[in-house]
Amino acid sequence: MEEVKKDVYSVWALPDEESEPRFKKLMEALRSEFTGPRFVPHVTVAVSAYLTADEAKKMFESACDGLKAYTATVDRVSTGTFFFQCVFLLLQTTPEVMEAGEHCKNHFNCSTTTPYMPHLSLLYAELTEEEKKNAQEKAYTLDSSLDGLSFRLNRLALCKTDTEDKTLETWETVAVCNLNP
């Protein structure tokens, strides 16, 4: 019997068409100075264990069904301790944002002990603390009105995301759904 291929999938909430270009421009500018792979602006709402493509699509469809578009607000530009959380926009943990994360986590049977930290990554990179601080300052120089910025997340994307691949070349968007207003 042939073994069915299983992959790690992520569910991303995508910013609306109005705010996406602003984030892309900021990400592009940071990447040109500090290097790092290109990726679309997104807020990760769930990461699965290994799933087959069929399992992932079914879970994704059911997650999309029960979720409405929602608003997120930037708390501040922050830095993290690993590659995929190098420099990011930390989002306010409003009930709306936290419920969206919980909703998707439940549909994907995510059993994580880490509390949900909603954020929109600006840069994936291996930087020193000094470089991260510089990138953080640069983000504010490029866009001084980030703190308190509110934007809509109106789509979900199902993505195959092998976290071992730091080039992101194997990352693939499998499906996108528009959320009800």
Swiss-Prot record:
Belongs to the 2H phosphoesterase superfamily. CPD1 family. Keywords: Cytoplasm, Disulfide bond, Hydrolase. This is Cyclic phosphodiesterase. Its EC number is 3.1.4.37. Gene3D superfamilies: Cyclic phosphodiesterase (3.90.1140.10). It comes from Arabidopsis thaliana. The lineage of its organism: Eukaryota, Viridiplantae, Streptophyta, Embryophyta, Tracheophyta. It is found in: Cytoplasm. Hydrolyzes ADP-ribose 1'',2''-cyclic phosphate (Appr>1) that is produced during tRNA splicing into ADP-ribose 1''-phosphate (Appr-1''p). Also acts on nucleoside 2',3'-cyclic phosphates. It comes from the Eukaryota. GO terms for molecular function: cyclic-nucleotide phosphodiesterase activity.
